[in-house]
Amino acid sequence: VVVCPVDPYVDNIYYEAVEQLQKLAEEGNANLTLMGIEPTYPSEKYGYIMPLSGEKVSKVKEFKEKPNKETAEKYINENALWNAGIFAFKLSYLLAKAHSLIDFTDYRDLFNKYDGLKKISFDYAVVEKEESIQVLRYSGDWKDVGTWNMMAEVMADKTKGKVVLDEECENTNVVNELNIPILC
């Protein structure tokens, strides 16, 4: 199983890396396989992966979700990678982990207990505590396009589709997926 966010800005080798991630998970050398990104600044928005080596695929010494800025700087100085939010694992691992964290007998029982489950992310509940993790270093283009500001930054043109911008429009980006012109 490979879990991916839907909002990264990536190049085509990203998809090859996701395939490689899936193959690494199938091989079973670790319970979890993560994709690591070379950090460009100390961020409190990402988890940090501390690999044991500088190789393309490495065992992980430690994973820390969203540290403060000072700790993020320390991790970067120790060659940590950002967690891209991409996890690969065998389904049997996830089922065993779910049973160890939640007392349930079958899907219906789990469904009935859903509202009472603790609200905690996979990163905190599972990844930070997992001892058997490996990381695949991703070297292509990657940006987390989770905000409109970042979307505007990665757009090559200020407009997409049938758009006419007035000369006085400032700080305006328009994406028009309709066949009807937009005048701004």
PLM feature spans:
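A conserved mid-domain beta-alpha-beta active-site/ligand-binding segment of alpha/beta enzyme cores
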Residues: 72-92, 98
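Conserved beta-loop-beta/alpha segment of the NTase-like Rossmann-fold superfamily
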Residues: 1-54, 95-100
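Left-handed beta-helix
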Residues: 89-184
